[in-house]
């Protein structure tokens, strides 16, 4: 099994800020080097990764989510995708995934899953209303950027974000969310308190060994279209969970990827299937 991860909205604000220019990410260095015969030159400092994605349209600060990267499609808008990152936050691999969704016509609002889970744990109540927070994030983006008020967002997530996608879809039971796509899915999160059942009766089990997170039960209450892209070479999330969790759902499919590990490091091995999955969810909700 993979890593265990780690509302009432007291306040929800959106402050528009310009996208900051950033340097390109550095190329990876060689794994090993031969010791030089002469004294080595002073080590060259590596460039820091970009603080912001230059492709983002705006960054907004939203209570409970922190800084959210917002992307605007070039042509006519076809919907809104709320994108939950993996444990690493909003950077690196998830950016390509977000850019692809934008290319299909979505507005995309990308947020750091660790920040989101931390805020849920810190909120009042015995359980976390994750579905409700996601709905309020959608409302904030819709109002800030003038999207149609009846926008029904989809949710996309990678790694721990993929788990969030399942949980909120199962909680929501098809009421406010239009569908979802999970990349690298397994059913556990490092959280301190459980998610609320929601309309769909979501349940989970407390881990009895460290680090004492929660493992979500399979609930056949995902009423919106759901796609899981699962690497067959994934050594973090057991690939068996993907087909098991989609079975019995209203419109769900596990797309197994033979040459893909948990890192989704080679886009040619998964990007076409990801594109097709996002397109399927888009078309199913129209």
Label the model's feature ranges.
Residues 33-76:
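N-terminal cap/lid segment of alpha/beta-hydrolase-fold proteins
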Residues 124-147:
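Alpha/beta-hydrolase active-site loop
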Residues 260-271:
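Catalytic histidine-centered segment of alpha/beta-hydrolase-like enzymes
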Residues 269-286:
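Catalytic active-site module of serine/aspartate enzymes centered on a nucleophile-bearing elbow/loop
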Residues 74-106, 110:
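Short, surface-exposed "cap/lid" segments of acyl-processing enzymes
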Residues 84, 232-234, 259-261:
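Acidic beta-to-alpha connecting loop that harbors the catalytic carboxylate
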Residues 190-248:
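The feature captures the conserved acid-bearing segment of alpha/beta-hydrolase catalytic domains
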Residues 140-212:
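Primarily recognizes the serine-hydrolase "nucleophile elbow" in alpha/beta-hydrolase
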């Amino acid at each position: 099994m993979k890593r265990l991860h780690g509302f009432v909205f007291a306040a929800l604000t959106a402050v528009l800020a310009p996208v900051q220019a950033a340097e390109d990410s550095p190329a990876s260095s060689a794994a090993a080097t031969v010791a030089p015969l002469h004294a080595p030159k002073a080590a060259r400092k590596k460039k820091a990764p970009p603080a912001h994605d230059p492709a983002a349209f705006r960054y907004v600060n939203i209570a409970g989510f922190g800084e959210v990267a917002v992307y605007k499609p070039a042509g006519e808008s076809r919907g809104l995708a709320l994108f939950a990152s993996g444990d690493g936050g909003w950077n690196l691999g998830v950016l390509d995934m977000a850019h692809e969704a934008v290319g299909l016509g979505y507005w995309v609002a990308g947020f750091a899953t660790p920040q989101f889970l931390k805020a849920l744990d810190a909120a009042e109540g015995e359980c976390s209303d994750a579905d409700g927070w996601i709905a309020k994030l959608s409302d904030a983006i819709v109002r800030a950027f003038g999207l149609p008020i009846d926008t029904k967002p989809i949710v996309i997530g990678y790694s721990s974000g993929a788990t969030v996608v399942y949980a909120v879809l199962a909680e929501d039971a098809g009421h406010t969310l239009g569908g979802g796509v999970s990349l690298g899915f397994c059913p556990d999160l490092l959280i301190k308190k459980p998610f609320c059942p929601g309309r769909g009766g979501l349940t989970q089990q407390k881990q009895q060994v460290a680090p004492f997170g929660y493992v979500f039960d399979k609930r056949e209450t995902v009423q919106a279209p759901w796609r899981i892209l699962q690497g067959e070479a994934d050594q973090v999330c057991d690939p068996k969970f993907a087909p098991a969790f989609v079975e019995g759902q209203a419109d769900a499919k596990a797309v197994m990827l033979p040459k893909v590990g948990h890192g989704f490091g080679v886009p040619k091995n998964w990007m076409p299937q990801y594109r097709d999955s996002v397109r399927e969810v888009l078309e199913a909700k129209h």
